[in-house]
Regions:
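Loop-helix junctions at membrane interfaces
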Residues: 4-7
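C-terminal boundary of histidine-terminating zinc-finger modules
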Residues: 167
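Short clusters of small/polar residues that mark proteolytic maturation junctions
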Residues: 21, 35-36, 59, 108, ...
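Acidic, metal-coordinating catalytic segment for phosphate/diphosphate chemistry
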Residues: 9-44, 50
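Short loop segments at secondary-structure junctions
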Residues: 27-28, 49-51, 60, 123-128, ...
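Conserved Nudix-box catalytic region and its N-terminal flanking loop in Nudix hydrolases
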Residues: 2, 34-39, 43-88, 135
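Unchanged
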Residues: 32, 41-44, 75-161
């Protein structure tokens, strides 16, 4: 059931993504065109504070035109492991670092057209450790009990897929 690339053309190279158009050979002998968004892997972190609350960030997301509640997350830089990327995102987005960081697993964000792999971590035993946030991020930090998180997922208040997946993996 695999497809084999016959031709590949990069049509866009940006700071965060690249886009290529591939012609592939199908298992049935046919051909198809696949548009692929190339995206670096990302770390998604579910931080739990000393009171047992989940720490999330609220930030405006231009592509969807609204403010979303999300787990701290971001691209893993070329010189980073998923763990170091997760720690950096925690420091940039919520001002803490985790003394205990446990890998929960990974998933493909949107495998129908994108190769982004999300690595999910549970962060506990948090200690203050601030890094400067990215210049283009405007983030509010909020805390919620696990029961509040479960209710917010059920009622659709948390709309970001990576956050829903990471929270369900963690709690």
């Amino acid at each position: 059931m695999t497809e084999r690339a016959l031709d590949s053309t990069r049509v866009y190279d940006g700071r965060i993504i690249a886009v290529r158009v591939d012609t592939v050979a199908l298992p049935n002998g046919g051909r198809a065109v696949r548009e692929v968004v190339e995206h670096r892997p990302a770390a998604v972190v579910v931080p739990i504070d000393s009171d047992g609350n989940v720490v999330l960030v609220r930030q405006y997301r231009y592509p969807v035109g609204k403010t979303l509640l999300e787990a701290p997350a971001g691209i893993i830089e070329e010189d980073e492991t998923p763990e170091t990327g997760a720690q950096r995102e925690l420091q940039e987005e919520i001002g803490f670092r985790a003394r205990a960081l446990r890998y929960l697993g990974g998933f493909w964000s949107t495998p129908g057209f994108c190769d982004e792999r999300m690595h999910v971590f549970l962060a506990t035993d948090l200690e203050p450790s601030r890094l400067e946030p990215d210049a283009d991020e405007n983030i509010a930090v909020e805390r919620f009990s696990v029961s509040e998180i479960q209710q917010m997922i059920q009622n659709g208040e948390i709309e970001d897929a990576k956050t829903v997946a990471a929270l369900l993996m963690a709690i």
